[in-house]
Design a protein with these regions (language model features):
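N-proximal low-complexity "stem/linker" segments adjacent to membrane-targeting elements
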Residues: 5-44, 51
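Residue-level signature of catalytic and energy-coupling elements of molecular machines
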Residues: 24, 42, 99, 114, ...
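Short beta-strand/loop segment that forms part of the nucleotide-sugar
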Residues: 26, 50-62, 84-85
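Acidic helix N-cap motif at the loop->helix transition within catalytic regions
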Residues: 33-37, 65-74
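Short helix-capping segments at alpha-helix termini
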Residues: 46-52, 75-80
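A conserved acidic beta->alpha catalytic loop
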Residues: 60-68, 115-116
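Acceptor/aglycone-binding surface of glycosyltransferases and processive sugar-polymer synthases
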Residues: 80, 86-88, 92-102, 107, ...
Length: 203
């Protein structure tokens, strides 16, 4: 009996707990200027979150500039970088869903490469999921402060229209930048609908 107990104790001491992984999905269309800056910032956050593993999934959505070559160069120097490249532009929704299917993380984030989504928010979003029990945490733009008058009116009308034709309440100002648990990602990927509206699914 004592021998068995010693073996169990030895296993506990000697074994390492597997780190949780966050997959960062980054849809890219003609982002040659912003990609190096984004990569530098997001890898800084990854270094700060030492207890978590990361993978960075860049989706080249038929870019006409040097985006794909930059992604390939990042892949050569960082094995955490993975990518999908489309021969033509399928739109952001298509890129996001391709990334969701490709991601292997326990948590999955979607964010833009243009730095409108602060990479530093990943830490706070992860904390909210881990400590406060949320399944999905999203960033919102407060009252569209940076929008011009025409865009503000259009945006308001858009949300009213979607609210009328959808049974799911829409959150005005909700962005695509969000962090989700694996079970949320799996539920979305398992949906078979061809035309999916991401903000409606995430609401």
């Amino acid at each position: 009996m004592s021998t068995i107990r010693e073996c169990i104790m030895g296993m506990k001491v000697g074994s390492k707990m597997k780190k949780e992984k966050i997959s960062i999905i980054v849809p890219c269309y003609n982002e040659e200027e912003s990609l190096p800056i984004f990569y530098e910032e997001i890898t800084k956050i990854a270094e700060e979150m030492k207890k978590v593993e990361f993978e960075f999934i860049f989706i080249n959505d038929g870019s006409k500039d040097n985006t794909l070559n930059i992604i390939k160069d990042l892949r050569k120097k960082d094995d955490r970088v993975r990518f999908i490249s489309f021969s033509r532009n399928f739109g952001k929704e298509g890129g996001m869903y391709a990334g969701l299917e490709y991601a292997t993380g326990d948590f999955v984030a979607i964010m833009d490469a243009d730095m409108q989504d602060p990479p530093s928010m990943i830490k706070e979003m992860y904390h909210a999921i881990k400590e406060e029990g949320y399944d999905c945490v999203a960033l919102c733009s407060p009252k569209h402060k940076d929008y011009g008058l025409v865009r503000k009116i259009f945006t308001k009308c858009w949300y009213k229209l979607i609210g009328k034709i959808s049974s799911t309440p829409q959150v005005p100002g909700a962005r695509d930048f969000r962090l989700m648990k694996r079970k949320v990602v799996d539920a979305i990927v398992n949906m078979k609908e061809y035309n999916r509206y991401s903000k409606g699914l995430f609401s």
